Amino acid sequence: RMLKEAGADTVYLQPCMVPHWVRGDKETGYVKLPGGKKYDLKLTALGNSVGSGAKGVQSSVIEVRSMAELHDLGENVIKGKIVFFNIPMNPTYIRSFRAYGQAGIGRRSGPAQAAKYGAIGVMVRSLASNIDEYPHTGTTQYNDSFPKIPAVAISTKDAEWLSGELRKKTQLSVF
């Protein structure tokens, strides 16, 4: 209608297929701490992510700070674990989308690449320049050559906390 009103001489309405993803139930996750305590993570599923099922996903966490580090660690270290892509946005870039693009690699292709090495799930640091409790989501892309694994974004505050805890302890379990 608007195109015709604007004077376009030829307007077509054509059907097309578009991906459709529906967010499931509210996502929850936590880190199991010594003494039976837990730390609740602020997280949200990445767009296009598969769900974790009724039983969820639970495993130890391996932190990586780049795609190169993931590839260097390989299947012997990654298999059966949850990969935590802790790739912060570079605050020194004047053009914030440059930082966004570099940090976004973990979100865009991290789940597919982690699955290649046998990971059972992925957590990514939210793409935000500030430290806060609000997870930011976006989409991920899977590779049909590897299993689709659940993927979530965690808040930047929780990413900082989790990274610090991983430096202190050799094993942390996330559910």
Please tell me what each predicted stretch does.
Residues G56, G101-S109, A153-K157:
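Soluble non-cytosolic domains of exported or imported proteins
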Residues V57, I78, Y117, F146-P147:
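Short, solvent-exposed loop/turn segments at the edges of secondary structure
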Residues R65-I131:
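A conserved hydrophobic secondary-structure block that centers on an alpha-helix together
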Residues K116, I120, K148-F175:
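Long, well-ordered, tryptophan-enriched scaffold segments
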Residues V124-D158:
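Surface-exposed loop and adjacent secondary-structure segments within mature catalytic domains
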Residues R1-M2, G7, G106-G110, A115, ...:
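Stable alpha-helical elements in mature extracytoplasmic
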Residues T10, V61, V122, A151-A153:
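Conserved beta-strand scaffold positions in the cores of enzyme catalytic domains, especially
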Residues R1-I94:
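Noncatalytic luminal/extracellular "stalk/propeptide" segments of secretory-pathway proteins
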